[in-house]
Amino acid sequence: MVRHADTPTDAQRAREQFLSTGALQPDAVASSVLNSWQRSRELHVHPDRVELPYVRDPDTDTPLMHAAAPVLRRMAEDLSDQSVSVVLTSADGLVLDRVAADTEFERVLDDVRLARGYSYAEEFAGTNGIGTALETGRPAFIRGSEHYVGTLGGLACAGSPIREPVTRRILGVIDLTCRARQADPLLFVLAKSAGSQIEDRLRTMNNETETALLDAYLKQSRRYPGGVLAIGGDVVLMNRYLRQALDAADQTVLLDHAAELTRSSFTSTTVAHLPSGASVKISAAERIIVGVRSDSVVFHVSVHVAESIPVRSSQHIPRLAGQSSSFRRSAQQVERCYRDREWVVIEGERGSGRTYLGYSVVHFVTPERSIPVLHIDNFDTPESFVAAFESETDSADFAVIVSDVDELPDEVLNPMAAIMQTRAGRGWIAATTSTERDSQLVDLLMLPFFTHTVTVPALRHRIEDLQELVPMILNELSRGEARMDGEAMRQLAKLPWPGNIAQLRHVLTETVRRQRSGVIGVDKLPAECRSVTRRKLTPLEAMERDAIVRSLLENDGNKADAAAALGMSRATIYRKIKDFGIA
């Protein structure tokens, strides 16, 4: 039985005593309330003012929203003659929906920002039915002065966590809020009942989705002779062809790429290079739609096993660092193409080292040769770029690298294609392109001249290569006078590296500016190494992130002091720390 202060006056006196002394007599309030007050105090929540951030627009297209919608409507109808609001939040306390029949009471809730898009997590709102339920993982009933923030003292709220039926992970909270003077234990019972109803609906929806996914998987398995892979929530289905063709490491990388496609609304096909040296083309064959969601997908997977090539040591091409089999396989394939004078497309993400790979291979095989690298940005006009390409490919045994052909302006594609047609069968051209290219003209006019495509893996897919890449780049930047300690290397290995090796070089350049010699610790890494977000920040966001990280370091990690030093509110710094993935 949850114990509360016997009267509103008791709770008010207890709160005032806690705020003035930081301590309370035993049993002055329920232990769950006291623990929450202590957390709120440590989080520097203002005890007298509501300082809630507008976090983001709620995502209404989620399983939680679809499962909760009819429950919220039914409860709102049942309570239509009462001043009670039904509130649904996400797992981070963001208010997703609010339903209330009493318009006057809705204005009261607006005044304290218990509204869509605002967060009622404890770190912002202190002790309350939503945030405390999320923090403890248990239902919470907070009445009147049991709220840490005095402005909320006129309310009572009963919150019950909503859990994913299979994993039991908290998805959000269902909360019933009324005026404190109208608080009734029945509110607590209703909130828990509503939470159970929503979980039941989630379970039913999961069953429907899983059944639909299984049906689609079986249908595609009958129709498609190659690999079939299905992903939906926590369910992964893989046919025998893939289980036999790919080992555990290959399957892990395949699932990583397929999961990215599942989340993407812009592309439905990708090519992945696997640790074994095989490559796979992954294509979305069928998206499963239950309700209005389509986060379950069945893929066709075609596996291309590389021809047997003896695995050489990592010193085979001295300029290249990396022990991962996927990267070494890429290097060996480019080398073979160069030795056989077969034109090759080297594709990969920006900054992954595509041009450098081609250049290093040529330098290794023919060290006496100087190979030109042509990039449109290095020329004043498109015409001068085309002229340089024509000149560099004029000899009988030419070799040239054209960087970022997917960025070439349309007006150079036809003349480039005409030149390549006259050069076919002699010399060697390597063209680099992005795996995310969106240029139909390049695909139509340029790529048909190339007989091979080699994919350079993203740095996050060969993170073990940091053990060679970091010392190599550091040695170059510091002339052999600096090295990373173990903690710094572990922090680098945690990062997603959306900018790949180019980003790594930038990070190490900034690091060497701070410490030019000796053993470099984690504290010398630049601010971006504290951010684990996979998206690439805009220049302005990167500046904000760096300023926040510096302030946190200068204030020993105290978020409130860091916010004050930056002249921003505590709510703002919490939101930006989360947005930027600052660890």
Curated annotation (Swiss-Prot):
One of its GO terms (biological process) is regulation of DNA-templated transcription. Gene3D superfamilies: 1.10.8.60, 3.30.450.40, Homeodomain-like, P-loop containing nucleotide triphosphate hydrolases. Disulfide bonds: none annotated. One of its GO terms (molecular function) is ATP binding. Pfam families: HTH_8 (PF02954). The keyword Cell inner membrane does not apply. Keywords: Activator, ATP-binding, DNA-binding, Nucleotide-binding, Transcription, Transcription regulation. ATP binds at residues 349-356, 395-404. Residues 320-513 form the Sigma-54 factor interaction domain. Disruption phenotype: Cells lacking this gene are unable to express the mimABCD operon. InterPro entries: GAF-like_dom_sf, Homeodomain-like_sf, HTH_Fis, P-loop_NTPase, Sigma_54_int. Acts as a transcriptional activator of the mimABCD operon encoding the propane 2-monooxygenase complex. This is Propane 2-monooxygenase operon transcriptional activator MimR.
